[in-house]
Amino acid sequence: MISPGASRVSTPISACSGCRRRGPAMFRKILIANRGEIACRIARTCQRLGVAVSTVHSTADADALHVKVIGESIGIGGAPASESYLRIDAVIAAAKTTGAEAIHPGFGFLAENTDFARAVEAAGLVFIGPTPDTIERLGDKASAKREAVAAGVPTVPGSEAPSEDRLEVEGIVRRLALPVMLKAAAGGGGKGMRAISTYDGLADEIESAMREARNAFGDAGLIVEKLILQGRHIEVQIAGDGDGNVIHLFERECTLQRRHQKLIEEAPAANLAPGLRQRILDDAVRLGRRLRYRGVGTVEFIVAGTDYYFLEVNPRLQVEHPVTEMVTGIDIVEAMLRIAAGEGLPVKQDEVFCQGHAIEARICAEDPNDSFMPSTGELAHVRFPSSGIRVETGVESRSIVTPYYDSMLAKLIAHAASRDQALDQLDRALGETSIFGVITNRDFLRRLLALPATRAATFHTRLIDERIDALVTVTGAIDPEPLAVGAYFWMMRQRATASSNPWQSGSLTGWQMAAADDGLSPIPILHLETAGDSAEIRFAPLQPDGSMLIGVDDVKIQVRLSPLADDMFAATVNARCETVRIVQQDQAIFVHDPRRAQTMTAIPYLRYISTAAEISGELRAPMTGVVLKINVTVGSRVKAGDPTVVMESMKMELRIASEVDGVVTAVHFKPGETVERNAVVAVVEPDLIPQ
């Protein structure tokens, strides 16, 4: 039985062709060769159609939500994707073990792997997707570009074939002239992509892109294209029966991106001239017909003014497919199943309509205030809106976010009559979403939605880069109010557990507190640490009405909390009333109010140990990951800013740079080894230790 909690849909998605159940040609059972939210989402459609489902998991995902939701899962290897989700033999063996007739690849991993599609068919199973020949022609971006040219679709100038030779790629870059884009030939999703605007460090950028492409897709080949600045990313959802019949399900706007990864997607595209829209839709369908496309796919374009250029075809289900489902009412996963089962296209072109506007936001485990560094750990608390929004997720409270896979935790999808209404609906839903235990981009997304350019749909693909200062929180700009609320919560917990007067509790200070002139304790009782700052907390005695004056450094704030239900409280902060959610896990306190989410660590003052004397030459891992490359050896001389170690986490490369000039005195890890967050990777002895 598939749990409805895996993915909630408040606005129903109608089934193709009138919600038909499993037809005579439909599969009895399939295997989903994926994980996380997409595995849960595919399983939901299968349940509705009466199709049984099995799946696979790595050792890191043994207790993952998709395993619980689907109920039947086969372990296929270790935590790294190369040892599990990318193992073709293990996936096919799992399908046979569970009695599946077909395999749905989802997106990522093996979804665009020609060898996998061929192996599935060779094993007597059905691959739910395009033919292996189509994947081969489109999975390689250079080959896809040749197909587009043959179909009469305009393309971006660039290399004609992929290359794994760094020197050859470097030569192409110099011939095209800057700026250019390096792209992994074998896949998308922002992996193996680099925007190049300077020749400085070009060799390192090429090598890094190749490593990332190899790790993500098993192929290090790159292509080079001219980079079109300030363009819009428009893509068309197509579906074909394999016999030359191809339709479109209208377009999506995917312009709001960071590091070439989409964050906000919507359908239809706003402010797109009708004539331009029709030409783009027609070109996408014409290319699909030339390919005799089977299944669903996405034709991507870059739009600059009234001109547009073909980028690539993704021969698979897209992360952002829900926005198309919401405006067309067509279940795209069901369409994939019916086409693969030989039932043909579920609808005709003149039966496809676009109603209203849908917008999707991707919530990721990453810290926008720290260069979007991925965040890993246990999710202490997860809660999404209970109604009025579509939620696709693969996590729940107590889920573990590991460094081995993509950082996306959930997608929220709003659907309304107008774009403005959908934007407002999505913003409210993000505000009601609580994810504690890792740092997320939730507040960043809300600020992005509020930008005038976003509201007016006058954006381009570099908007986030250009407005990054307005989208991230300035380090050191501590907000005292959520800290005061967290401090009040902590004190009340102390009172409840100490069963004595907190001013005499040995767990706090060890001596009788005397009142200070300002009514607060004469010394700080609590030290609160946040991601980028810290504060000293002093308390005044609890008042008869339950309120308390709390000092956050030099700021005094009056706070009162009244329990509502579970982790919800009515908070009065300096006479302003609002509903907040507060969760505590060990010493971590998570406060979520209508405007922001704040994580803090509570350290009673006498246990507080200053970190000011830490050796600045210690190079620590910013998060759990795998060492890819060591650039130094013991005795190497480095300067501040020199990259010493290259790590990979969540399929993205991280470079650890020396903070000082000096000499390397220790290197504690080797390439291929896993490093825990905050572990000392190497040590640099500074040339001069500050006095």
PLM feature segments, named:
Residues 542-547, 551-568, 572-578:
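Conserved nucleotide-binding/hydrolysis modules and their immediate coupling elements
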Residues 284, 322-551, 555, 643, ...:
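Catalytic cores of soluble metabolic enzymes centered on carboxylation/carboxyl-transfer
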Residues 4-15, 25:
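Short amphipathic, helix-prone segments within low-complexity/disordered or flexible regions
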Residues 22-299, 303-321:
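N-terminal beta-alpha lobe that positions the nucleotide/phosphoryl donor
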Residues 609-691:
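Structured functional modules or segments
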Residues 577, 583, 587-622:
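Catalytic P-loop NTP-binding/switch module of NTPases
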Residues 198, 240-245, 303-306, 385, ...:
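Short acidic-glycine loop/turn motifs at beta-strand connectors
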